[in-house]
Amino acid sequence: MILRLYAMVISYCCAICAAPFQSRTTDLDYGPDKTSEASDRQSVPNNFSHVLQNGFFPDLSSTYSSMAGKDWNLYSPRVTLSSEEPSGPPLLFLSEETVVHPEPANKTSRLKRASGSDSVSLSRRGELSVCDSVNVWVTDKRTAVDDRGKIVTVMSEIQTLTGPLKQYFFETKCNPSGSTTRGCRGVDKKQWISECKAKQSYVRALTIDANKLVGWRWIRIDTACVCTLLSRTGRT
């Protein structure tokens, strides 16, 4: 019994000695490295400021590997980085049109929908929008207003390993040559004073602030044409 007790004590001591020592720093190995993230955020603007003074832009394909990829327009549908001007609307806008206006599979269903079904799309019923709008790719945007109300410079060209990329913005504006330049369509002019105005939304774009720091910021661009009303009687 005494020999067996000695053997158990020796095995327990050996097990304790063989266990690895864990310091308090091992807890920092789990999850993202906050220290490295903070250093990256500080080093990127410094690099950008340095290269801006030299007159050229850095290679962003290594810093932002997904920025120049094919899926970039899925992250920011109204902002596109491309070597040439896009020939059509963003993919998300095309997919939305496909969902809203699906083509019937056969002639029978086409005839049923044309005979007055509720599933007929608005455009096929002859309905018109209150304000005429037009979608355009803006290729020469120089400045914009960010979410803090500051005027920032929009980067027009970015150098990458595959060549220069330009920023294009898909904006929706009020049609200057449309029939709603003097008021909204379908509004009683005797009761209301109407006007079609551009509505702006925020998108992310690569910009330069007043301190010459480059970064992704929220800026305002035209994204819709809406109708504003003013009562002729109460002026409200």
From Swiss-Prot:
GO-annotated biological processes: cell surface receptor protein tyrosine kinase signaling pathway; modulation of chemical synaptic transmission; negative regulation of neuron apoptotic process; nerve development; nerve growth factor signaling pathway; neuron projection morphogenesis; oogenesis
GO molecular function, one term: growth factor activity
Record carries keyword Signal: yes
Tissues/organs with expression: Ovary.
Pfam families for this protein: NGF
Keywords (A to Z) from UniProt: Cleavage on pair of basic residues, Developmental protein, Differentiation, Disulfide bond, Glycoprotein, Growth factor, Oogenesis, Signal
Function: NT-4 could play a role in oogenesis and/or early embryogenesis. NT-4 interacts with the low affinity NGF receptor and elicits neurite outgrowth from explanted dorsal root ganglia with no and lower activity in sympathetic and nodose ganglia, respectively.
Name used for this protein in its record: Neurotrophin-4
Organism: Xenopus laevis (African clawed frog)
Name of the encoding gene: ntf4
